[in-house]
Every structure is written in C-alpha cells, then in structure tokens.
Amino acid sequence: AFIDEYTGQKNLELLAGLKQLISASDIHNTLQAVGLDPNDKRTFKKYSLGMKQRLGIAAALMEKPDLLILDEPTNALDEQGVAMIAQLIRKECQCGALVVVACHDADFVQSVSDVVIQIQAGRVTSVIGK
C-alpha cells in the first residue's frame, strides 16, 4: 500500500529504505521506465488510476526480482501504458526474470508470453506454448 500524502518518489524511497538495497538512482530510473516523472510533486492521492497502477508496477520492478507476479497489470492504463508494460515485461524476461501475468486481456497475454495457461472456473482448460 502507498501513503496518500507522499509523492510517488517518496513512496518508493520509503519502500526502498525497508530493503536497503535500492539506490535513489534505481528509483529515479524505475519511475521513468514506467512513464512517471520522478520530479512530479503531486501526492499519491492525486494520482489517476493509471498513475497508481504504474507506481505499483514500479515498486515491484525496482527490486529487480527473479520472479515477478503481475495481477491485471494493464488495468486503468491507456494504449501507450499497455505497450509500455508489455515492453517492460519482455525486458525483464530477457534479463532472466520469470514473469507470471494474470490478465483477462488474451491478446496482451499472448503478446508477452512464452506459455499461456487458460483457467476457467478454477480449472486449467488449455496450455499453449510458443
């Protein structure tokens, strides 16, 4: 969860402080990578839904995880934001991360996935690999 009265930058700095492994430069670069301005002085509560979504993704990315689990990462994003998320997912995979995406947008999932597992009513209904 993010603190409403803090900027996106300050929220990420707070999270980074808990890990003590993430530099100010990493935070700055991650905010830029998700399309947020690191110098934006607006507080989190004034962010649009799309900006909040981007900040959540930035929080996950800044840790440079080996496993990244994204639940509906395209929610509240415009076309440009969806393309940016797809590019970031591909980049993470190229860097060796395993990325798991849960999403109702089948076209998006297929565009970023090596393997697509379709689940309906709690059961696997198909597995498609590239």
Residues covered by each model-derived region:
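Hydrophobic anchor residue at the start of the ABC signature
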Residues: 57
